[in-house]
C-alpha cells in the first residue's frame, strides 16, 4: 500500500510504503525550505495509544541520550537527519498514523514547523489471490530483546536450549505466522475430494509432518517428492519423517545435486483427475531452521494456471524420479522463459542458462533502483548486473550473506560495507550456536530481487532459485517473476529493506562505538548532498518521494 501526502504548494511531501511488518516514510522538501532545517520529527499513533515521537540513535554534539537504556532520544529533541525513515515495529493488518514535522531552531531548542499527517494500513497477508508472509528471524534480534528480555537472557546463558522448550509466545513471534500459513494451506485439503502434491528438499519439522499425516488420514490424496541424494544425511531424515505414509504416496528424487524445491500444489479431484487450485512456494524448508532461524518467505498463489504449471513439473519428476536429465530436457522444452508476462513461473534444471540471462536482463532494465538479498556465489553476469557500474544512477540497496558473513551495498557498488552476521549474546548468540551443523549456509534464506521498487512498474524475482549456475542446470528449483504489482512489491521491498537496514544499523553502531560516526549536525549542512544534482542521495530523496 502506498500513500502520498503533500501541502498545497507541493514543496513538502511524504510518501509512505506499507509492507506486512514495516512502513517506509520518504520525505521531500523544496530547496529554498531546507535553509536552517535540523531534520524531521516523526510522531506515530496506532489504535487508542497516545501519539509518540519516534527515536533517533544519534544526538547533537555534547548531548546525552534522554533514554540512555535504549541509546536513543525522541526525534522532536534529536531530529532525524535523513530523507527516508523505516518503522519496523508494525504488525500485519494494522492502521498506523504518522505526523512528519519539519524541525528548525537550534540544537539546544529545536522548533517544530509545518507538519504533514497520513494514515496507512500494513498488509494482512491475506489478499484475494496472492499472499506472502515473512518470518521475523534474525533481523528482529533487537526487537526480540525488548519484547522477551528474560528469555533473551536465558538463551544467552544456555545457547543449546532447544526451541521446543521456549514459551509459545516467543516461538510464535519469531515465525510470525509463517508456520500457521503453511499448516493452513495443507488444511485446505479437507477430504478425499482433494489432493496435495508436495515437493520438498528438507521434510523434518514435526508440526508440518503431523499436519500432512492428518490430511492423509482424512482421505486426502497425498504425494511427496523428497530430496534423496545417495549417502546423504537429509535423505535419511526425510525418509524417517515420511514413515507413516505408504510407499505409493512418496518418492525420492535421486540426484547428485539438490532437489531444492519447496512447494505444495492443492488440487480438487473431479472425475478422478486433479484440478489444480493453488500453490504454496517460496524459500522455506520444512525444518526448525527454515521456520524459526533463517529469514524466509512463504508465497501462496490462488491461481489455477500457475498451480497447473507447478503440478505439470511435479508430474514429470514423479514419473521419472531418478532421471534428472529427463526433467532437464522436459523443462527446457516446455517451460521456455517468458518473463515479460505479468506473472511467470519458472523451473529448473534446464539447459542453456536462459533463466540466468532473463534475470540479468531484468536487473539491467531497472531504471530507478534494485533491492536484493542473495548468497555470495553468483555468476559474474548476475553479480555485475546487481552491482552495476560505479557511480551509475541506479540506487542499489542489497545484502550478500552467509551464516557468518554479511556484505551490504549502499546506493552504489563503491559504498560497500561489512557487518557482523551474528552477535554472541541473546537471540543471535543462540542462533549462532543452533545453526552450527545445520544444512544450508544462509542466514537470510529469502532469495529475492525487486527492481524499480519506487516506480509504478516494479518487478519481483522470488523463489528457491539462488541465481547460481548450479541452480540453473543442476538443482531442481522454482521461481516466480512478477511484474507491475506494486502491492506485492511493497511487501517484498519492505522486507528486503528490513534486512538491509538491520545490518546497515549494525555497521554504524560499531562505528559509533569506535567514535567513527559524527553526531547530528547543528545546522542544515547535513542536507547538502541531498541537493547536489546527480548525487545518489539526491536521487534517493526524489525517487522514494515519488518525484
List where the protein language model places each region.
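PLD/PLD-like phosphodiesterase catalytic module centered on the HKD motif
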Residues: 1-168, 179, 183, 194, ...
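Short, surface-exposed alpha-helical recognition segments that flank or form part
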Residues: 75, 169-177, 199-200, 347
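Aspartyl protease catalytic domain
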Residues: 140, 145-173, 305, 309-361
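Short, compositionally biased low-complexity segments enriched in polar/charged residues
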Residues: 173-190, 202
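Short, Φ-rich (hydrophobic/aromatic) sequence segments
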Residues: 186-189, 314, 362-364
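Structural motif
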Residues: 199-202, 228-229, 372-377
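Beta-propeller domains
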Residues: 331-398
Amino acid at each position: 500500500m502506498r500513500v502520498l501526502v503533500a501541502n498545497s504548494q507541493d514543496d513538502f511531501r511524504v510518501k509512505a510504503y506499507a509492507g506486512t511488518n514495516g512502513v517506509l516514510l520518504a520525505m521531500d522538501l523544496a530547496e529554498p525550505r531546507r535553509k536552517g532545517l535540523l531534520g524531521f520529527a516523526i510522531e506515530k499513533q496506532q489504535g487508542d495509544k497516545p501519539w509518540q515521537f519516534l527515536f533517533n540513535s544519534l544526538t547533537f554534539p555534547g548531548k546525552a541520550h534522554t533514554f540512555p537504556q535504549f541509546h536513543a532520544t525522541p526525534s522532536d529533541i534529536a531530529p532525524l537527519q535523513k530523507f527516508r525513515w523505516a518503522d519496523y515495529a508494525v504488525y500485519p493488518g494494522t492502521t498506523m498514523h504518522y505526523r512528519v514535522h519539519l524541525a528548525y531552531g537550534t540544537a539546544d531548542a529545536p522548533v517544530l514547523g509545518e507538519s504533514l499527517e497520513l494514515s496507512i494500513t500494513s498488509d494482512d497477508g491475506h489478499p484475494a489471490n496472492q499472499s506472502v508472509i515473512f518470518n521475523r528471524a534474525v533481523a528482529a534480534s533487537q526487537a526480540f530483546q525488548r519484547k522477551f528480555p528474560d528469555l533473551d537472557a536465558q538463551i544467552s546463558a544456555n545457547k543449546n536450549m532447544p526451541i521446543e522448550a521456549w514459551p509459545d509466545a516467543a516461538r510464535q513471534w519469531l515465525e510470525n505466522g509463517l508456520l500457521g500459513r503453511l499448516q493452513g494451506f495443507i488444511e485446505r485439503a479437507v477430504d478425499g475430494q482433494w489432493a496435495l502434491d508436495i515437493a520438498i528438499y528438507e521434510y523434518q519439522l514435526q508440526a508440518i509432518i503431523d499436519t500432512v499425516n492428518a490430511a492423509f488420514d482424512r482421505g486426502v490424496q497425498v504425494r511427496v517428492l523428497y530430496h534423496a541424494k545417495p549417502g546423504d544425511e537429509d535423505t535419511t531424515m526425510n525418509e524417517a519423517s515420511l514413515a507413516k505414509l505408504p510407499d505409493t504416496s512418496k518418492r525420492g528424487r535421486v540426484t547428485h545435486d539438490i532437489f531444492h524445491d519447496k512447494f505444495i500444489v492443492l488440487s480438487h479431484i473431479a472425475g478422478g483427475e486433479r484440478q489444480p487450485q493453488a500453490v504454496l512456494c517460496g524459500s522455506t524448508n520444512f525444518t526448525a531452521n527454515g521456520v524459526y532461524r533463517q529469514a524466509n518467505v512463504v508465497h501462496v498463489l490462488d491461481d489455477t494456471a500457475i498451480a497447473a504449471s507447478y503440478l505439470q513439473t511435479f508430474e514429470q519428476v514423479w514419473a521419472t524420479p531418478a532421471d534428472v536429465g529427463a526433467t532437464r530436457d522436459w523443462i527446457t522444452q516446455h517451460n521456455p522463459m517468458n518473463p515479460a508476462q505479468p506473472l511467470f513461473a519458472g523451473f529448473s534444471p534446464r539447459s542453456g542458462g536462459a533463466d540466468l540471462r532473463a534475470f540479468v536482463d531484468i536487473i539491467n532494465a531497472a531504471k530507478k533502483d534494485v533491492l536484493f538479498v542473495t548468497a555470495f556465489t553468483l555468476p559474474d553476469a548476475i553479480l555485475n548486473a546487481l552491482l552495476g557500474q560505479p557511480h551509475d544512477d541506479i540506487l542499489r540497496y542489497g545484502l550478500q550473506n552467509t551464516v557468518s558473513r554479511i556484505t551490504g551495498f549502499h546506493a552504489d557498488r563503491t559504498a560497500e560495507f561489512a557487518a557482523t552476521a551474528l552477535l554472541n549474546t541473546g537471540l543471535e548468540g543462540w542462533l549462532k550456536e543452533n545453526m552450527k551443523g545445520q544444512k544450508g549456509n544462509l542466514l537470510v534464506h529469502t532469495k529475492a530481487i525487486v527492481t524499480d521498487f519506487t516506480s509504478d512498474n516494479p518487478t519481483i524475482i522470488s523463489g528457491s532459485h539462488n541465481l547460481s549456475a548450479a541452480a540453473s542446470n543442476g538443482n531442481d528449483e522454482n521461481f516466480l517473476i512478477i511484474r507491475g504489482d506494486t502491492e506485492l512489491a511493497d511487501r517484498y521491498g519492505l522486507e528486503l529493506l528490513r534486512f538491509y537496514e538491520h545490518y546497515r544499523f549494525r555497521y554504524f553502531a560499531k562505528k559509533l562505538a569506535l567514535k567513527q560516526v559524527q553526531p547530528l549536525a547543528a545546522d542544515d549542512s547535513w542536507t547538502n548532498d541531498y541537493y547536489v544534482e546527480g548525487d545518489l542521495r539526491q536521487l534517493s530523496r526524489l525517487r522514494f518521494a515519488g518525484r
